[in-house]
Amino acid sequence: MNDETRDLAVLSRRAAMLGGLLAATTLPAGIQAGAAAQPIAPQDVIPLWPDVPPGGAQVTVAEEVVERPHPQGLRDRIVRGVRTPTLTPFLPRDQARAAMLVIPGGGYKHVVIDKEGYETAQWLAAHGVAAYVLRYRLPGDGWAAGPDAPLQDAQRALRIVRDRSERLGVGRQRTVVLGFSAGGRLAARLAT
């Protein structure tokens, strides 16, 4: 067992939370460089719920993807009015050493899908981690669960990621969560 494998094997919940916090403050520059050097495309999109998400019978929001200008020309999209929560997997070319649920931020007003989601996942996949980006429902969009709608999506997403991790041969012990901003708060709620 090499040092990297041993380090992944001994991650505890607290270490994973601290690592996620540190990564959230240090990854963006590395993500841009790593993603440009080895682009990895998502494999598919996985709907979290088989039909309408819980408490969504009366929800009327329309999903909108907004392209924001970026000073360095990078793609910077946000998603508002998420009606169909999804997971977008980015799998490494070789055997995955770990799996990570990536929860973008956006202040619970929108989901910052590119720089806090896809770019992070591309970087992780280029470094041997199976990354799954969560596009979650927003609490102000009229869901019956209100502020707990994003948590319902995160809980379901983590169950799906753990199941897929088992199939990839990674295992639950090497499945962690990384969240940015509001996604970080959501990740912390998952740990309780």
Language model: regions and residue ranges:
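Loop/turn elements at helix/coil->beta-strand transitions in domains of secreted/extracellular proteins
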Residues: 97-98, 129, 173-174
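Short amphipathic alpha-helix adjacent to the substrate-entry channel of hydrolases
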Residues: 114-132
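Short beta-strand element of the alpha/beta-hydrolase
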Residues: 97-105
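Cap/lid segment of the alpha/beta-hydrolase catalytic domain
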Residues: 107-116, 133-152
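C-terminal segment of classical bacterial N-terminal signal peptides
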Residues: 26-33
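N-terminal secretory signal peptides and thylakoid transit peptides that target proteins
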Residues: 2-24
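N-terminal cap/lid segment of alpha/beta-hydrolase-fold proteins
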Residues: 39-94
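Primarily recognizes the serine-hydrolase "nucleophile elbow" in alpha/beta-hydrolase
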Residues: 156-192
